[in-house]
């Protein structure tokens, strides 16, 4: 996949697996064009992603995207005061004349089939890019996403956060490779691995990732284990390690009882 370029579209700042997905991309030196953030506190999410990139030593454009239709009181659960630092501001807050949707569309025009979108949050940004320039978006290499459940009658979180956007993406001409929750929910770390993730030492980057992990875990019930759903998407982009079955996908939006399934 050496010719491929990737954009990571993420709701980093909720579940901790988004942070580890970005961590995996950084450590594997995945050819990321940039990161776009989505859903409710998109600006704060962008600051978290930007801080990770800065502490890692990577020059990586980060764009705050669309917040969606949900209310957004308060802050991301990982929000801390030091994210106010200008060094961690999203690029479209620091004078770069592009927003997340423009960035996706312009990348689609430039890279065509070599561009793959890694969607590990609600599909709001990607649907907006499709609606803005369907011609450019239809020419990209596809979407690898974490979202949905293709074995059970269940409305998965990323789909539920913007069901109309998911409908737009699934109804488009884009090739979609999806990791459903019925698969990703098996990617639970061991107790030993979790202790390491909670107590990383060394670089400021490792300490920050460990801090995010601890802040996230405080919001969970005792004994909660980390599940790295979103890492599977980035690993697939890096290693192409999974086999897939092709299915006909229909997202229900007519029935009140099965809406989003």
Locate the predicted segments by residue.
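A residue-level signal for conserved active-site and pocket-lining positions in enzyme catalytic cores
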Residues: 62, 169, 234
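Short, surface-exposed amphipathic charged segments that create phosphate/polyanion-binding patches used
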Residues: 75-84, 156-161, 194-195
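Conformational coupling and interaction surfaces
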Residues: 2-6, 20-27, 31-32, 160, ...
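Active-site histidine-anchored catalytic micro-motif
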Residues: 2-47, 51, 90-192
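A glycine-rich helix N-cap at a beta->alpha junction
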Residues: 52-66
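Short, hinge-like loop/turn segments at secondary-structure boundaries
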Residues: 51-53, 79-81, 136, 195-197
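Surface-exposed loop and adjacent secondary-structure segments within mature catalytic domains
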Residues: 63-90
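Metal-dependent catalytic neighborhoods of phosphoester/phosphodiester hydrolases
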Residues: 43-53, 72-75, 79
